[in-house]
Swiss-Prot record:
Signal peptide range in chain numbering: 1-23
Organism encoding this protein: Sarcophaga peregrina (Flesh fly)
Domain C-type lectin: start-end pairs: 51-159
This protein's record includes keyword RNA-binding: no
An MF annotation (GO) of this entry: carbohydrate binding
InterPro entries noted in UniProt: C-type_lectin-like, C-type_lectin-like/link_sf, C-type_lectin/snaclec_domain, C-type_lectin_CS, CTDL_fold
Cystine pairs: C53-C157, C132-C149
Function description: Role in the defense system of the organism against microorganisms. This lectin binds galactose.
Protein name in UniProt: Lectin subunit alpha
Length: 283
């Protein structure tokens, strides 16, 4: 079966896309919980490797402890299967010395090496041209070597030191803000609860004063009504007593008048009767 030119072109495009996709290094999680990006293709000098890491918003790896070194060795074993030429982030600042003890520095941080995993008789600065640090494929123990910075190798990247430091500082600030906000919220809730209790107490006191006031007003009204009733009764009694006394006086006066009239009539009748008798005798 023959292939048309269109089929061939499609296959080539697919192969290019597949190859490009497959060549992109992926983040790998190590035993220390951190993620590293490992490029195994031997086509980058040290500076190119640095730039590649930067393009992924990362940096060439720094190894400051045996624990971190062991985690990276374990990761390389799992990803590559054996020791491999991989650029690290260290260099000797292009020192001309061939002293094995010459200082090396981690470029991402500027810090001098506090830990190293050199292979035997290294770093030797062979021909005064070896200034950059890498894991050496000729050493099965994944030991380090100094080499010409222009040699093509793979590389190992890790999260950017400054961004990681910034993120950590930002995280700490955020945590501090959360704690402060939580404290303020707690204090506000406590103050609000206290004010609510005080308000409830004041409300209860006002209600009690109002109730007591109503009771006192009612007592005063009752006392006033009783006093008025007593006054009215006293006035009525005085009026009755005065009326009774006046009536008795009138009755006594009438009786005296009657008696006086009767006496006068009787006396006048006797006189008239005597006069009549006298008249009868004379006439």
């Amino acid at each position: 079966m023959s292939l048309t030119m269109k089929n061939v072109e499609g296959f080539v495009i697919f192969l290019v896309i597949f190859t490009s996709t497959a060549a992109v290094p992926q983040l790998q999680k190590a035993l220390d919980g951190r993620e590293y990006l490992i490029e195994t293709e031997l086509k980058y000098n040290w500076h190119q490797a640095w730039h590649e890491c930067a393009r992924h918003d990362q940096q060439l790896v720094t190894i400051e402890s045996a624990d971190k070194n062991n985690a990276i060795i374990d990761l390389v074993k799992r990803v590559v299967g054996k020791s491999h030429n991989l650029w690290l982030g260290g260099n000797d600042e292009y020192s001309s010395s061939r002293d094995y003890g010459r200082p090396f520095f981690w470029s991402p941080t500027g810090q001098a090496f506090s830990f190293a995993y050199w292979s035997e008789n290294n770093p030797d600065n062979y021909k005064h041209q070896e200034h950059c640090v890498h894991i050496w494929d000729t050493k099965p123990l994944y030991q380090w070597n100094d080499n010409d910075c222009n040699v093509k190798m793979g590389y190992i990247c890790e999260p950017n030191h400054f961004r990681e430091t910034y993120d950590q500082a930002l995280k700490q600030k955020c945590e501090a803000i959360k704690i402060t906000n939580s404290k303020i919220s707690t204090e506000f809730d406590q103050l609000h609860a206290k004010q609510s209790l005080e308000f409830d107490s004041i409300t209860q006191n006002v209600a009690k004063v109002n109730e007591d006031w109503k009771i006192e007003i009612q007592k005063l009204q009752n006392a006033t009504q009783i006093a008025i009733q007593q006054i009215m009764e006293n006035h009525e009694k005085k009026i009755r007593d005065l009326s009774d006394n006046l009536l008795k006086q009138l009755q006594d006066s009438n009786e005296q008048l009657k008696q006086s009239t009767d006496h006068m009539n009787a006396s006048f009748g006797e006189k008239l009767k005597g006069q009549q008798a006298e008249n009868n005798e004379i006439c």
